[in-house]
Curated annotation (Swiss-Prot):
It comes from Xanthomonas campestris pv. campestris (strain ATCC 33913 / DSM 3586 / NCPPB 528 / LMG 568 / P 25). Its EC number is 3.2.1.52. The gene is nagZ. Belongs to the glycosyl hydrolase 3 family. NagZ subfamily. It catalyses: Hydrolysis of terminal non-reducing N-acetyl-D-hexosamine residues in N-acetyl-beta-D-hexosaminides. Pathway: Cell wall biogenesis; peptidoglycan recycling. HAMAP family: NagZ. Keywords: Cell cycle, Cell division, Cell shape, Cell wall biogenesis/degradation, Cytoplasm, Glycosidase, Hydrolase, Peptidoglycan synthesis. It is found in: Cytoplasm. PANTHER family: BETA-HEXOSAMINIDASE, BETA-HEXOSAMINIDASE-RELATED. Pfam families: Glyco_hydro_3. This is Beta-hexosaminidase. Substrate binds at residues 60, 68, 133, 163-164.
Length: 331
């Protein structure tokens, strides 16, 4: 199945046609798709109305520099701010992370959007793309935050997506623009980067997003193209039973599988349930690529339509209103 990107704040005729395709499971929204709270709710409704089957509508609303919906939404802190507090006040830091998750999820759901791809559970060890998106460089600290964040998302009615498996934080390269390779063996990864993923899976995480990083001592392909990582380690060894998302096939580190069709097939063949096609110019070719494939159409049902509050419902919710006052609102 595919999660696709659309170009603007309203659906075009071509995009409505795409949503009719059996392989399209939903839409990923970006800054380019956002103008206001009202508009994004209308866009979400239009996406659902255009498709003959339920659609999963997603966004990256992590906080800090990765927050696609801004004006009219709470200013969410980057996750690293909670990690910094943990050294002096661990319980307070975990409580703030739970509040962050609850507020983010409530506002996203109020907009008619099902899922924010969160939390980032990579280690904060110098990666250019991750940076302050990660809680900490300590695996056990990140594991504690991961458990708390997953539980808070569930309490707010949203699924949890752990990213970027099996850990993107230690390589320096940004896989949006470059290839990345992590030379460490599996036993080291299990003792370090994979610790938060294990904690999140144990806490009931609903989904995992793969990294476009190569770990050559484990598999020769980027993790999202490697059945060794997805089928043997994630599902087999770690016992994960949820949804596996690829990362975006428009990123430079994904190009090792060849053209658009090659990337789509490589992810699906490796065991990904859903391939992210975030660039609209890649959607038509991706749809051609999946023609004739058997698709796991039931995989996303548990993430779709958990019941949007609407903004009236959100504002009437006293705990969420007090959280918003604590974090502040973007004008």
């Amino acid at each position: 199945m595919l999660l696709i990107g659309v170009a603007g704040t309203e659906l075009s005729a071509q995009e409505r046609d795409w949503l009719q395709h059996d392989a399209v499971a939903g839409v990923v929204l970006f800054k380019r798709n956002f103008a206001s709270r009202t508009q994004v709710a209308e866009l979400s409704a239009a996406i659902r109305a255009a498709a003959p089957r339920p659609q999963l509508i997603c966004v990256d609303q992590e906080g800090g520099r990765v927050q696609r919906f801004r004006e009219g939404y709470s200013a969410l802190a980057p996750l690293q701010s909670f990690g910094a507090l943990y050294a002096t006040d661990p319980e307070g830091a975990l409580a703030q992370a739970r509040a962050h998750a609850q507020l983010m999820a409530s506002e996203v759901r109020a907009s008619g959007v099902d899922l924010s791809f969160a939390p980032v559970v990579d280690l904060a060890r110098g990666n250019r793309a991750i940076g302050d998106r990660a809680f900490s460089d300590d695996p056990q600290v990140v594991a504690s935050f991961t458990r708390a964040y997953v539980q808070a998302l569930h309490a707010a009615g949203m699924g949890a997506t752990l990213k970027h498996f099996p850990g993107h934080g230690t390589v320096l390269e940004d896989t949006h623009v470059d290839h990345a390779s992590d030379p460490r063996p599996l036993d080291v990864l299990l003792a370090e980067d994979l610790v938060p993923f294990v904690a999140g899976i144990d806490a009931g995480a609903d989904a995992v997003m793969m990294a476009h990083v190569v770990y050559p001592q484990v598999a020769p392909e980027p993790a999202g193209y490697a059945s060794r990582w997805i089928e043997q380690i994630l599902r087999g060894q770690l016992g994960f039973r949820g949804v596996v998302f690829s990362d975006d096939i428009g990123m430079a580190a994904s190009f090792s599988a060849g053209g658009v069709a090659g990337r789509v097939h490589a992810h699906l063949d490796a065991g990904c349930d859903v391939v992210l096609v975030c660039h609209p110019e890649l959607v038509a070719e991706s749809l051609q690529a999946v023609a004739g494939r058997t698709l796991n159409t039931a995989a996303l049902i548990g993430l779709i339509g958990r019941g949007a509050l609407g903004w009236d419902g959100l504002l009437a919710d006293a705990p969420t209103t007090s959280l918003s006052a604590s974090f502040g609102t973007l004008a």
